[in-house]
UniProtKB/Swiss-Prot annotation:
<dbReference type="InterPro" id="IPR036465">
    <property type="entry name" value="vWFA_dom_sf"/>
</dbReference>
<dbReference type="InterPro" id="IPR023481">
    <property type="entry name" value="Uncharacterised_ViaA"/>
</dbReference>
<comment type="similarity">
    <text>Belongs to the ViaA family.</text>
</comment>
<comment type="function">
    <text>Component of the RavA-ViaA chaperone complex, which may act on the membrane to optimize the function of some of the respiratory chains. ViaA stimulates the ATPase activity of RavA.</text>
</comment>
<keyword id="KW-0963">Cytoplasm</keyword>
<dbReference type="GO" id="GO:0005829">
    <property type="term" value="C:cytosol"/>
</dbReference>
<comment type="subunit">
    <text>Homodimer. Interacts with RavA.</text>
</comment>
<protein>
    <recommendedName>
        <fullName>Regulatory protein ViaA</fullName>
    </recommendedName>
</protein>
<keyword id="KW-0143">Chaperone</keyword>
<dbReference type="Pfam" id="PF05762">
    <property type="entry name" value="VWA_CoxE"/>
</dbReference>
<dbReference type="InterPro" id="IPR008912">
    <property type="entry name" value="Uncharacterised_CoxE"/>
</dbReference>
<dbReference type="InterPro" id="IPR002035">
    <property type="entry name" value="VWF_A"/>
</dbReference>
């Protein structure tokens, strides 16, 4: 069967112009105009999708099949082009009957053209074929437009669904244009309204806990750029004025204990003339406990020193992925569970904004994994947020899973984050030594987010940084009172 792409080539119909008109009409639709005004960050992300839309439309037109009636009419037209005028005159009745049988738009006009001329000349033959070709071009263009209209409706429906999802999640997850673009890419999955309400719910909870949000931001910024001295910098002499105590004091400021013989009080000096107190005088002299005058004074002098002319290099510290381990034991239920999930959502927001990866592992009796920054990040986040925290605590397995992932090439610069109340058994010696090796040799950093003030110090001592967020009732009331 004839394809629409072949028909367009045969009739020299340009589908590119039709595709561009359709895309312009789609972008100018009132729904998108309102959305762009409300969420300007997502405008660029949607605009970046236009090449993909264009390619999808080309593919749709290329693979579309031409209706059998139109295919038969096109074949008849091609055969008629090969006929001479005498042959065309002989075949004309069959051609007219075929057009009538196919309900061709050209059928009625063709018969009128033939009836209006008693003799079929070469010029009439050419005119007949030209008008027939125009009729076929109109039919092909109409077919293209119908298919594009169907695609436009389908595409608009898809875009509206993604706009609804992205519009709901943009205030929660999109901190800049980069995050907005990644959020738009992740919104392509098949999600229902009830699904992403989990993210909205924990986003609202995070806004109610600004201290928790700030804690996540501090952890995300913890690998800041720093300056380091240059070894090859040239030295230059600098002079500056410094203030120091004067050699000749200006006034008496009080009394003090010291060994300053020149400023002894008369009663202390009198002890030297008493034999019984002489040794006591020397003892207090050695111990600097003689009462003396305290004199006060200061002066300025010039200090000369050398320092490098350009003494610092800017050492940009890379910000790698997050590997987050979340304790899902029974003691982490309730408010602790809400805080842990909201904290992971805050890290996901940071990862999207800074083009980093965010990998979540839940540990209790088994380990469950989610990647919140991948193409299916929203679906993964929903699955994570819908998990219930019930089980035991196996912190050693958590560390082993982290260390296994850190040894892979794509996670070599990752930061490991463990969220727990750290009420657990001590870590085995082999785990502790392996963690210290990763910290020392590979510069991996381990962060602890402590949800309790009663975590075991022996466990927490292994971490580079400890971020405390006490979820006890007293701390919660204090935070609420401060707000």
């Amino acid at each position: 069967m004839l394809t629409l792409d072949t028909l367009n080539v045969m009739l020299a119909v340009s589908e590119e112009g039709l595709i561009e008109e359709m895309i312009i009409a789609l972008l100018a639709s009132p729904q998108l105009a309102v959305f762009f005004e409300k969420f300007p960050r997502l405008k660029a992300a949607i605009t970046d999708d236009v090449p993909r839309w264009r390619e999808a439309l080309r593919s749709r037109l290329k693979d579309a099949r031409v209706p059998p009636e139109l295919t038969e009419e096109v074949m008849c037209y091609q055969q008629s082009q090969l006929l001479s005028t005498p042959q065309f005159i002989v075949q004309l009745p069959q051609i007219l009957d075929l057009l009538h049988r196919l309900n061709s738009p050209w059928a009625e006009q063709a018969r009128q053209l033939v009836d209006a001329n008693s003799t079929i000349t070469s010029a009439l033959h050419t005119l007949f074929l030209q008008r027939w070709r125009l009729s076929l071009i109109v039919q092909a263009t109409t077919l293209n437009q119908q298919l594009l209209e169907e695609e436009r409706e389908q595409l608009l429906s898809e875009v509206q669904e993604r706009m609804t999802l992205s519009g709901q999640l943009e205030p929660i997850l999109a901190d800049n244009n980069t995050a907005a673009g990644r959020l738009w890419d992740m919104s392509a999955g098949q999600l229902k309204r009830g699904d992403y309400q989990f993210i909205v719910k924990y986003g609202e909870f995070l806004n109610e806990q600004p201290e928790l949000k700030r804690l996540a931001e501090q952890l995300g910024r913890s690998r800041e750029a720093k300056s380091i001295p240059r070894n090859d910098a040239q030295m230059e002499t600098f002079r500056t004025m410094v203030r120091e105590p004067a050699t000749v004091p200006e006034q008496v400021d009080g009394l003090q204990q010291s060994d300053d013989i020149l400023r002894l009080l008369p009663p202390e000096l009198a002890k030297l003339g008493i034999t019984e107190l002489e040794y006591e005088f020397y003892r207090r002299l050695v111990e600097k406990q003689l009462l003396t005058y305290r004199l006060h004074g200061e002066s300025w002098r010039e200090k000369v020193f050398e320092r490098p002319v350009v003494h610092k290099d800017y050492d940009e510290q890379p910000r790698g992925p997050f590997i987050v381990c979340v304790d899902t034991s029974g003691s982490m239920g309730g408010f602790n569970e809400q805080c842990a999930k909201a904290f992971c959502l805050a890290l996901m927001r940071i990862a999207l904004a800074e083009n980093r990866r965010c990998y979540i592992m839940l540990f209790s009796t088994e380990i469950v994994r989610y990647e919140l920054s991948g193409p299916q990040g929203i679906e993964q986040a929903i699955r994570f947020l819908s998990q219930q925290f019930r089980g035991g605590t196996d912190l050693a397995s958590c560390f082993r899973a982290i260390m296994e992932r850190l040894q892979s090439r794509e996670w070599f610069d990752a930061d490991a984050v463990v969220i727990s109340d750290f009420i657990a058994q001590r870590l085995p010696d082999d785990v502790t030594s392996k963690v210290k090796e990763l910290q020392r040799v590979h510069q991996h950093r381990f962060h602890a987010v402590a949800m309790s003030a009663h975590g075991k110090p022996g466990i927490m001592r292994i971490f580079d940084h400890i971020w405390r967020f006490d979820t006890g009732m007293r701390s919660r009331l204090l935070r609420r009172w401060r707000r």
